[in-house]
Amino acid sequence: MGVPMAKNLINAGHEVTVWNRTSDAAKPVVDAGAALAATAAEACAASDVTFVMVSTPEAATAVANAAKDGLSAGKGYVDVSTVDAETSSAIAEIVRSTGAEFLEAPVSGSKKPAEDGALIFLCAGDETLYRRCSEPLETMGKAHFFLGDVGQGAKMKLVVNMIMGSMMTAFAEGLTLSEKCDLDPETLLQVISLGAIASPMFALKGPTMNAGAFPPAFPLKHQQKDMRLAIALADQLRQEMPVAAAANELYKRAARDGCDDEDFSAVIK
């Protein structure tokens, strides 16, 4: 996700400095014209605004701690990772302790929208930084929303991904049932596309699911992580989540069966 986002910034004329925990992963961005920093702090020191995209709450916290020595008053730190609200608040505290501003901006969208500059940013935190970031956000995405205090963006993203994950399990069950009924799966996709339940996700994922192919646009391990975090959020609020909880069990089973690094649509297995 971070690679196409950075490339879009470069293509729009921004000076970009990159750092990655795995140095080889930064090579495509360096080849596209970015400077390579030796450390996270060095990348922040070289940048007015730093965007961070990592895969887990633990990684997001570790990167913030590694980056803080490069932050200072006047700089901005935008974490676009999907984390829980508590982690985002902890990162905000780390960043703000340096005098820098913080914005959480988790994205709705996967690899293809990232490549196309069509992500949706769910932002919360320092509104002045949000306004400063409007141009790069528009370069990397098709929409961005300011949702208030730190934590609100994280919560919105978990709600969105919980809905997406639950929809996918229902879709997978429908495809499987149609196959067992000797119904043509391609006809099923056509019927769905013409009715009230038509969905871009179903149209995109249906053909590859029918073909048994699961190239990872959004890895299953990340979907299961987001289901877990959404269910934990609901537990805090004493909100029943029977559908999401049942869907999460299917993702956990798929992960145990070796589908962690396949697309989340591999839950159909």
Tell what function each PLM region has.
Residues M1-V52, K75, K111:
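NAD(P)+-binding Rossmann beta1-loop-alpha1 motif at the extreme N-terminus of oxidoreductases
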Residues M5-L9, I91, P136, L177:
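Hydrophobic residues within alpha-helices
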Residues V16, L36, E101-L103, H144, ...:
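Hydrophobic beta-strand scaffold residues
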Residues R21-T22, T56, D126:
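Residues in the short beta-alpha loop(s) of Rossmann-like NAD(P)-binding domains
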Residues A40-E101:
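Rossmann-fold NAD(P) dinucleotide-binding segment
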Residues Y77, T82-M162:
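Rossmann-fold dinucleotide-binding core
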Residues Q152-V267:
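Helical "substrate-binding/catalytic lid" subdomain
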